[in-house]
Amino acid sequence: MSSAGQSNAVIHHEDDNVAIAVRPVESGEAVVVKAEERVKAAEDVDVGHKIALCSIASGGIVYRYGEPIVEATQAIGAGAWVHVHNTRPIPGDVEA
């Protein structure tokens, strides 16, 4: 569990709607970024994985580094793990 004020996730850009876990985060644990509680984790999230900071509608875009990275394939609740099981490449995106 996170100590009061101790960050367990990072956000790379102010427009991001996901945080990245810097250590494993347990279901029900506060997701803390720069000493500010953002959401409660809806499920266990491993280090390096994304956590939704707000609800993301099906078809909504996930932003990291202020850039669109994937599209939600289903509604993703605040605090949920964001990964390949609930996202896909943005239609029309071409990989370099």
Language model segments and positions:
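N-terminal small-residue-enriched
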Residues: 2-96
